[in-house]
Amino acid sequence: MKKLLIATALVSIAAMSAPAFAADAPTIPIIVKDTTSFYWQIVLAGARKAGKDLGVNVPELGAQSESDINGQISILENAVAGKPAAIVISPTQFAALGKPIDEAAKKVKIIGIDSSADSKAFTSFLTTDNVQGGRIGADGLAAAIQAKYGKAEGDVALITSIPGVGSLDARAKGFKEELAAKYPGLKLVADKVADGQATTALNIMTDLITANPNLRGVFASNLIMAQGAGQAIAENKKADTIKVIGFDSDDKTVKFLADGTLAGLVVQDPFRMGYDGIKTALAASKGEKIETFVDTGANLITTANMKEPRSVELLSPKVK
């Protein structure tokens, strides 16, 4: 009941903060994993811009943490009850959101973004090819290790934020497959899973440094893990010997990239994901033909290319 009340409050607050349109303007809520994360704020900014451009009411909804699975389910149920034109959602957990999305799709068109769920009911799905994102992470890590040590050889580790998240599982899959296929000299000595908190990533990274004196590289597969891993590298002064590739960006990780604490960032286009999610949902609500899958892309940004125009655009998106 408590989570339901919280979810209801979030729905109400988001609805009140949405821009005013004509009474007959369609409403398309967007439900993200975590409204406090910079990444998701960029997604919401894209959705907000689409709402203004297309004349759509876009309530911005989501729990306060990616681990609040029940909270997101309650928010989805409340959104469906409001009888919107469509709903855009990034599921927090692959298995747990499957049935709720199946049920929601019986009443309204569901557009998925970023992470999938155990459901075939999505009308369309927009995401980074996260398997490819993992491969890009492996390639970036191998290049950084080779630049430092002369060869892409040595011990490496993987840090994943939360278990059972479709996008993160796909990144891990791509990372491991790329290591096996292209970099036999890189040995995965640790495959760690956290609880979605940067402090946990900090502790995991610190423990890896202590337990693995020959560690040469780490792939931290989302923003929060990159924050924590980068902090541990900075505190232990290991940037020269341990190369870390993160995933996604914010002010903290961009600073880490600029000063060499992080060797690179695999960066998505979350603004496009939010914008095109609303655009696709509106088209679907009108019965227009839409793509069932859209790859929104990912790019490796390093210190060497971070000042290029496209890199600047991705690293410094406008969220207001």
Feature roles, as predicted:
Residues 7-15:
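Bacterial N-terminal signal peptides
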Residues 3-5, 21-320:
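A residue-level marker of the well-folded mature domains of exported/periplasmic proteins
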Residues 17-19:
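N-terminal signal peptide c-region/cleavage motif recognized by signal peptidases
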